[in-house]
Amino acid sequence: MMRLIIIQSIFLLTGSLFNTSSGYTQEKWTLEDCIEYALEKNIAIKRQEISARQATNDYKQSKMERLPAVSGRASHSFRSGRTFSYDILEYVNQEYQYGQITLQGDLTVFSGFEAQHSIKKNEYDMKAQLSGIEEAKYDVTMNIVTYYLNVLSNIEQQQIKEEQLEVTLEQIEQTKQEVEVGNKSKGDLLEIKAQASRERLELTRAKNNLKLAYLDLRQLMNLDTTESFRIKSPEDFTSLSENAVKTTNTIYSESVNEFPSIGHAKYQMKSAEKNLKIVQSKRLPHLSLGAQYGTYYDELRKDQFNLAYDRQISENMSLVASLQLSIPIFNKRRIHNQISNAKLDVLDSKYWLEQQKQDLYKDIEKARNEVISAYEEYQSNLESLESMEEAFNYSQEKYNAGLVDIVEYRIAKNNYNSAKSDAVSSRYFYLFKMKILEFYMGKEMEI
């Protein structure tokens, strides 16, 4: 349950999100807010919770199966036909009524420990379903992180495009003045205007990409609102540092016993083992105790022997107790084949658990290497951005002084713009990979 506790603890740090009965009314959403809302509204999680409740009911019922079963029955019948008459001592055609009242119960004394094994099996099935809830929450959480970071990335990409266009528009005004005094040619002005047109197109695309990113996030959250939906951009990225990353084995050893998919597979294996015990118990003798207490009445006895209904019911009371022993001898090898299949189920569940552990180790190993690679790429892009910025500033100074033409200036500006976009993309790529690794490490999912 550690993963669920980790996710829930995030929400306690973010404060209350519900302000009115209509739902979420805050202007900007943090990552924790988005995760909380998505977990609450996700249909797959709700369905998994239903399955868990059903498994819980099965577990409770299996414990009740050890108790005796008691039932009562009453019947009243009408009959028409040949019946022996005690009045004339011969068979005659007549109509009459009769009935009976019984109370019966039975108790399983010994069933080869099937009841005990069934209780444990249903308990493991219940725990497997609860682990399934955590699995579903893990998937939703990671998807929200992905889409949330995609929105943040597109926000910065749009800001970059806006800044690029703003610089170009300022350059247009400056070039106009240079053209008027004869320091620049009209061709230079047309080139810069063409550059502005291209940057307007890029800005339009950036805005559309941001709208789609918001739409993807909102749909994943199942957030149906006509109000403005905006997320909160972090003030800084404190996790964007070369933190000491634990070894793969260390992260794996800390996660293997707490990760939802491992817990799910482990409980499925234990359930299969108990199911084998249940099937094997069918080879053992079964002993049950039964009892029946009842009475009956007959209209013929009332008419022919002057026995009233209440007197018949009182005099006809009887008690029957039985002890039943069932010993399996030969049943066409049905139990033998059931045991064989149950053993194969146990073996398959063990392989599945081992497969889940291998996949977890591989995922952690891959995530760790991707974090290191993404961090190195991000640092390289920062260095490239710094160099491109210096080159652009130098080119801009030379262009303003008339020492370089518009083509060289435009190349320097495009290189600088590209470097800024690459730096933003690599930053969010690194941050996403770091969030995945931190989740394996048991850290809070926050930005």
Task: Please tell me what each predicted stretch does.
Residues 1-37, 207-250, 438-447:
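Terminal intrinsically disordered/low-complexity segments used for targeting and assembly
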Residues 24-71, 81, 231-275, 372, ...:
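Bacterial Sec-pathway N-terminal export signals of envelope proteins
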Residues 24-147, 287, 291, 333-336:
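Short flexible linkers and secondary-structure junctions
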Residues 46-50, 63, 95, 109-137, ...:
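Sec/SRP-type N-terminal targeting helices
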Residues 50, 201-223, 385-443:
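Short segments within alpha-helical structural elements
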Residues 57, 139-254, 370, 374, ...:
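Periplasmic alpha-helical coiled-coil/stalk elements that build and connect Gram-negative outer-membrane
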